[in-house]
Structures are given as C-alpha cells and as structure tokens.
Curated annotation (Swiss-Prot):
Site residues, Transition state stabilizer: 379
Residue positions the entry lists as glycosylated: 40, 93, 278, 297, 413, 566, 570, 581
Protein's recorded name: Putative pectinesterase/pectinesterase inhibitor 28
Low complexity composition bias: residue spans: 570-620, 633-732
Residue numbers binding substrate: 327, 357, 469, 471
Function: Acts in the modification of cell walls via demethylesterification of cell wall pectin.
Family, similarity comment: In the N-terminal section; belongs to the PMEI family. In the C-terminal section; belongs to the pectinesterase family.
Residues annotated as catalytic: 380, 401
Protein source organism: Arabidopsis thaliana
Location of region: Pectinesterase inhibitor 28: 51-204
GO cellular component, one term: membrane
Residues making up the signal peptide according to the UniProt record: none
Length: 732
C-alpha cells in the first residue's frame, strides 16, 4: 500500500519513528501514574557507553519539559534493548507491581490518619490513581493493535487519556487543601516524578501529532463522516429506545418511589446493572425526588438514565465543603462509566451559598451526553472533571464557578442561570482547570443564553456576573453565538488572584449577542484571543470533541459545525428534525453581533421546564426525540434584554425575570470573602481555587512539576464583588 512516498526506506523510517515514540510514550504513561516511583542514577554514568537504546530515548525525550526525569526513568529498566515492544512490556510489568505496592502503602497511610478530611483526601487519591491505571490498560491494548493508517485516531485517544491523568493527579493534590498533618506533603513528594512524566508524555504525543499533521498522509488524515451513522457502541435496541416517546419505552429497569417499578431507589437498581458490557442498558427513573448519592462506576459503561422531565425526576443531595468534605466528594451524582447518557433529569445540591463548594454532579465519563437536564446548585454546581462531554438544551444554575473542571466539553443551546450569591460576592460562571497548554481540554459555550433569577437581578449592581476566571494556569474557554445580558460588565472576565494565569489562559468570544456582548471594553490580557475562521472551526463539536463519531443517532439535536452570524447555521443538525435553513451572516467570526434588547425567539431547543428554567423552546422537537424538552415551562426566567433572533435557543419573553449578575464574588466558595468587596480570601482546595502560592514557573512557561505551583484545589475563594479586587479562590 502506498502512503504517498516513493522512497520505501523513508516510509519504513517514518513507521519506525511512530512505533518507537508511541512505545516510549506508553512507558512514560505507565510510570506517570505510579506514586513514589524512584529515579536511580547510575554511579558510573560518566563511563556509560551510549547504546542504541540510550540514543533512542534521548531523541524521544527531546521535546519534553523534564528531560532528565524522562531519560533517567526510561533507562532504568531498558538495559541494552532497543526493541520498542520489549521496552513497553518491561515497563508495563514493573509498573503494575509498583502500583500494587503503592496501593498497600496508601491504605496504611489512611489507617494512620487522625484528621477525617486527610483520610478522605487519601481515599480520593487512591480512587483517582486507579482511574489512571484503567486508562493505561485501555491505551496499552490500543497500542497492541497498532495500525499505521489509524495512528491519528490513536493519538487523539492518548491525548485525551494524558489530559485526564493530569486532571486526576491535580485533583488528588487538591483534596489535601484544609487538611491537618503531613499526608498532603508526603503525597505531593511521591507524585512529583509522576506529574513530570505525565507532562512529558503529553509533550511526546503532541510533538508526534504535529509531525504527522505535516506529513499530509491521505490514509491517516482522512476521517469518515459519521453524521449519518450511529456510534459503534450504540446497539439497535438502544437507538429505538432513545428515539421513542417515554410511553413506548421498555427499559431494562424501572425505578419508582411509588412501588410501580422493580426498585424504589436508584442505588438498588445500580446493583443489577451489567458490568463491562458493550450493550446499552436503560434505566427509567420515574417522577420523584430521590434523596440519595449515586455513583455510576467505571464498570457501568453504556448506561442510560431517562427521567420523566427535569421538573419531575430529581436526584438531590446536600454535601458541602463546609461540612468537612472535599469538593470532589460533595457530588450528589458522580458519573465515571464511559458512554453515559442522561435525559429529562435534574441533579441538585441544596447545601446553599452559605456552605461554599457543593457539587451537584461530577462527570469523568468519556463520550457522555446530557440532554434536557437541569443542574441546580450554588458554588461549583457542575464539575465537568475530565474527558469528552456534550450538553444539549440543559440549564445550569449557580453563583460562583458553577461550571468548572478540566473536561473537553461543549454546551450547545444551554442556559446559564445566575443565582443570588452571598453579600459582596461576584459570580464568575466558568472556571476551567487546564494545567498544561498541550491538554486537549476546554469549555465551549455555543448558542447558549445567560440569564438571572429574580433574586439575583435585585442585587446585580452589587454582585456582577463574569464570563469566567482562570482556575489553573492554562484555563481555556470559548464563548460563541451566545446571548450575554447587561449584568455582565464591560470587562467581561475576572482574574483569579492577581496576575495568575493572565498571560497563559485562552479565552475567546465569537459572534455573541445581547447588551453585554460588546468586546470594545473587554480586559486586554495576553491570553485573550481573537480567532480566525479556521481556528474557530477547531472548537466546534465535530472537531473539538470528535462529536461526529459518537453524538449522532441519539435523538439529540446536534449542530456539528459553526452557526452563521447570530445563531444561524449552514451545518447539518443531526439527531433531530430541527431545520437550519437560516442565512449565513457576513460577520467575521471574531466580530461581535450588535446586541439586541431581547433574547432571540427560536433558539434551537430549550432547557428544562422547572421553575428555575429559563428558556422555552420556540421550535418544538419531534415526538420521540431523546427527551424533547417540555413545551411549557412552569416558570420562565428571561433576560432583561432579549437576545437577537436566531439564537440556538431563546429565553422566555418575560424580560423582567432575567437576572443580571452582580459584582460580588459567588457565595459558598471555600474561603468566602469578607463583607468588604475589596477583601481577598485565600483560595481553598476546590476546583476554582486561587493559587496557594505564586507558581514556581512563570505563567508563560510550561507548567512546573511541583504541585504547589498550581492554584488551590478547587475554586474555594469567593471572588470579590468589586472588579478591582483580586478574586478569591472559590473552587475547593
């Protein structure tokens, strides 16, 4: 088979380079998830003969940030072999034993701890390292069936895995914020080499991706268009269920509090979910408020939750950081099993603003979909932790950093509902946590609407709403074709703490509308980007999260590309009968559409119909779609000024209900600010926490291996209401 090159030797060399780099990369990944790996240097290193293996390792380590760690680690067990497969086998076997030993030591540390929060943090680390090992196993298998013409797909998966591993490591360390004793320092030292090796592995795969992109090999760079196909893991029965009206659905299990199903609680039902199956398993959760804490474990893949509507089926909890629980562990619902789908359900945390960080849902599942769902909380409501996620026609409510995490997530036609925070707290909406510039993660808000509850609108002058702030150094958020109300101040974005992340973040606004959409007075940090047409395309669902391979076929309205102008699109809408016969705007993608005073009628879908819902669909979805949103919301909160017509979803017509954010920092962050707007609270361990110390590496440099350089674990410091005040860390 020809790959576009005449020289057979050149082809052979390129193939060898790819296999070699992939193999050594895997070794790095294996070692990276090992806590306490030791790097032993040879006493006679000066006399060591430079072998073929050493030369190969030096070449592979060239693009990394921590070259010495890279070379020393790979040479430790490589001996004189230069066979990539043997290197992989040796490293894999040695690492599995190392991880087993570390697990035993971690358990011993847990048993010796007197501080309950420290015990919880150690348990959290143990869980997260286990997830990383699971990802490694899948990667090892993927590499075992290596196919040259599919290497680009393999690289995408490896980048996703490495990005998630960085998130796991950082979340482990974040859990020790506010703990007593030396457990946190012990784990930080043990993880130092692992953190460095993970960043090194990501550097290798990124370098390889760039190299392959320049090669322009047709067989590798061509991708099948899957918009008319169903994902490989979606069986025919599941497709029928997801596209059928609820009255016709015959789920595998029914949960009903009134006794009309097989089980009365969700956790009872989960005991009967098949483990590690490749077929979809559907759970119908009937109307009711389910006060239980639910975790969809890693083994529960291809699971579907279908409710009776986000105003009827509610999963409710109230755990909070203030109660002595790590932010990670406060989640009412945790989704870990890949290929998860939820429709017509509400997830809530009722702890309130006074309790600081309190997560309604934490999502780690790759290729997860949420349609017509509601996420209610205050600080840190939706924890989009890691991997690829897609949200359509959902409502997310909160005060501070209520959309945070390090996932690659697209929110299409969703409503961001700002709630009343504590006194003098500002309300930053997003707090993305990217730690490495090479991570394939970030938040994309496409065709969304920002609105406020009436209680918030009453204090919007004192508590401003911001589009977001940088939780970690390389925070990335793109907002496009979205309605931005008047309670978002002209500066738009809020700093985390001082100058932290302002040079290295990646924020961009594209063709937004509404009275707060003008960018002429936005902050001018080095990290604010003006994207070209070509660059914008990279952040659409089809390219950014490879959505064409797994979103179509679910009955979920899905726009795979760009909207034209203020919400119109010439892209295909798959999985629904919604039309996209709108004209293309001549505006440049980086141009802001002149804000209109009312939200556009005809947004592509609407959020849930619960009292806090904000948008009601102007266009009804066809019966039988995956949880088509109810047509009549019981209560509508709409923007004070309406967004331009043509948005992907429009708020209700009642302008008075739209609440604009105030300048105060969000209530409930770990370390809520004092009543004085200018006061700054030290960041806590939660997701949006401000840095505990100045980063050891300049923001413009690559992330330091030392965990202490990053901001606190979760947004735990509430931002001050005053724009001039340094925001306090609030994710924690």
């Amino acid at each position: 088979m020809s790959y576009g090159y005449d020289d057979e030797d050149a082809k052979r060399k390129k193939r060898y380079v790819i296999i070699s780099i992939s193999s050594v990369l895997l070794i790095s990944m294996v070692v990276a998830v090992t806590i306490g790996v030791s790097v032993n240097k040879s006493d006679n290193a000066g006399d060591e003969e430079i072998t073929t293996s050493v030369k190969a390792i030096k070449d592979v380590c060239a693009p990394t940030d921590y070259k010495e760690t890279c070379e020393d680690t790979l040479r430790k067990d490589a001996k004189d072999t230069s066979d990539p497969l043997e290197l992989v086998k040796t490293a894999f076997n040695a690492t599995m034993k190392q991880i087993s030993d570390v697990a035993k030591k971690s358990q011993t540390m847990i048993e010796l701890q007197k501080d309950p929060r420290a015990k919880m943090a150690l348990d959290q680390c143990k869980e997260l390292m286990d997830y990383a090992i699971g990802e490694l196993s899948k990667s090892f298998e993927e590499l075992g069936k290596f196919e040259f013409h599919k290497v680009d797909e393999a690289l995408v998966k490896l980048r996703i895995w490495l990005s998630a591993t960085i998130s796991h490591e950082q979340t482990c360390l974040d859990g020790f914020q506010g703990t007593q004793g030396n457990a946190g320092e012990t784990i930080k030292k043990a993880l130092k080499t692992a953190v460095q090796l993970t960043h090194n592995g990501l550097a290798m795969v990124t370098e390889m991706s760039n190299y392959l992109g320049q090669m322009q090999i047709p067989e590798m760079n061509s991708r099948r268009l899957l918009s008319q196909e169903f994902p490989s893991w979606m069986d025919a029965r599941a497709r029928r269920l997801l596209n059928a009206p609820m009255s016709e659905v015959k789920p595998d299990i029914v949960v009903a509090q009134d006794g009309s199903g097989q089980y009365k609680t969700i956790n009872e039902a989960l005991n009967f979910v098949p483990k590690k199956k490749n077929t979809t398993f559907v759970v119908h959760i009937k109307e009711g408020i389910y006060k239980e804490y639910v975790q969809v474990n890693r083994s529960m893949t291809h699971l579907v939750f279908i409710g009776d509507g986000p105003d009827k089926t509610v999963i409710s909890g109230s755990k909070s950081y203030k109660d002595g629980i790590t932010t990670y562990k406060t989640a009412t619902v945790a989704i870990v099993g890949d290929h998860f789908i939820a429709k017509n359900i509400a997830f809530e945390n009722t702890a309130g603003a006074i309790k600081h960080q309190a997560v309604a849902i934490r999502v780690l599942a790759d290729e997860s979909i949420f349609y017509n769902c509601k996420f209610d909380g205050y600080q840190d409501t939706l924890y989009a932790h890691s991997h690829r996620q897609f949200y359509r026609d959902c409502t997310i409510s909160g005060t501070i950093d209520f959309l945070f995490g390090d996932a690659a997530a697209v929110f299409q036609n969703c409503t961001l509902l700002v709630r009343k925070p504590l006194l003098n707290q500002a309300c930053p909406i997003t707090a993305h946590g990217r730690k490495d510039p090479r991570e394939s993660t970030g938040f994309v808000l496409q065709g969304c609407t920002i609105v406020g509850e009436p209680d918030y609108l009453a204090v919007k002058e004192q508590s401003k709403t911001y589009l977001g702030r940088p939780w970690k150094e390389y925070s990335r958020t793109i907002i496009m074709n979205t309605f931005i109300p008047d309670f978002v101040p002209p500066e738009g974005w809020q700093p985390w703490l001082g100058e932290f992340g302002l040079n290295t973040l990646f924020y961009s606004e594209v063709q937004n509308t509404g009275p707060g959409a003008a960018i002429t007075k936005r902050v001018t940090w080095p990290g604010i980007k003006k994207l070209s047409d070509e660059e914008i395309l990279k952040f659409t669902p089809a390219q950014y999260i490879q959505g064409d391979a797994w979103i179509p076929g679910k009955g979920v309205p899905y726009i795979l590309g760009l909207f034209s102008g203020n919400g119109s699109t010439n892209s295909t809408v798959t999985g629904s009968s919604l039309s996209s016969n709108t004209t293309e705007s001549s505006d440049s993608p980086s141009t802001v559409v002149t804000p209109s005073t009312s939200p556009p009628a005809g947004h592509l879908g609407s959020p849930s119909d619960t009292p806090s819902s904000v948008v009601s669909p102007s266009t009804s979805l066809p019966a039988g779609q995956l949880g088509a949103p109810p047509a009549t919301p019981s209560m509508v909160v709409s923007p004070s000024t309406s967004p331009p017509a043509g948005h992907l979803g429009s708020p209700s017509d009642t302008p008075s209900s739209l609440v604009s954010p105030s300048t105060s920092p969000p209530a409930g962050h770990l370390g809520s600010p004092s009543d004085t707007p200018s006061s700054v609270v030290t960041p806590s361990a939660s997701p949006s926490t401000s840095p505990s110390a100045s980063p050891s590496v300049s923001p413009s440099a690559f992330p330091s291996a030392s965990p202490s350089a990053s901001p606190s674990a979760s947004p735990s410091v509430s931002p001050s209401a005053s724009p001039s005040a340094s925001p306090q860390s609030s994710i924690g």
